[in-house]
Amino acid sequence: MPKESYVAGIDVGSTTVKLVIMNAQHETIFARYERHYSDVKAASARVLKEAMTELDPQTVVQCTITGSGGIGLAHLLQLKFIQEVIACTKTVETLIPETDVAIELGGEDAKITFFGASLEQRMNGSCAGGTGAFIDQMATLLKTDANV
């Protein structure tokens, strides 16, 4: 009997590495969010190794990489790269199709996508960059956890 196959998405951003593995029913099999502290290769390797220990060695995983730091990793691992705004849009359309608007805050920028009769996407300018890092700084200042 063939093993179940999964899809995986890796987002290598300016401050974090995120990995999600899902089955054909869109159920999350594995998920990790880790700060890379500018050591993208080591953090990516840790997250991927951890995922591999949780999966059967015979499991087939179709993997796509995105994010501002993902293009180098995709090239290194010879995996498909997709631009992050496109990745976010496709994911929202697939998993939560009733969505009207999606806002994505990253470490370097913010993006907003309006869904409807026609798709409209906008991204902030460089003068407003670091939105995710700003949220982290404010959480530290307020002595709270930005991950909650």
Where in this protein do the model-derived segments appear?
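Short beta-strand scaffold segments in enzyme catalytic cores
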Residues: 17-22, 109-115
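Short beta-strand-loop/turn "lid" adjacent to the catalytic site in phosphate-handling enzymes
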Residues: 33-36, 52-86, 113-122
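Short glycine-rich, Thr/Ser-proximal phosphate-binding strand/loop in the N-terminal lobe
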Residues: 4-42, 46, 121, 125
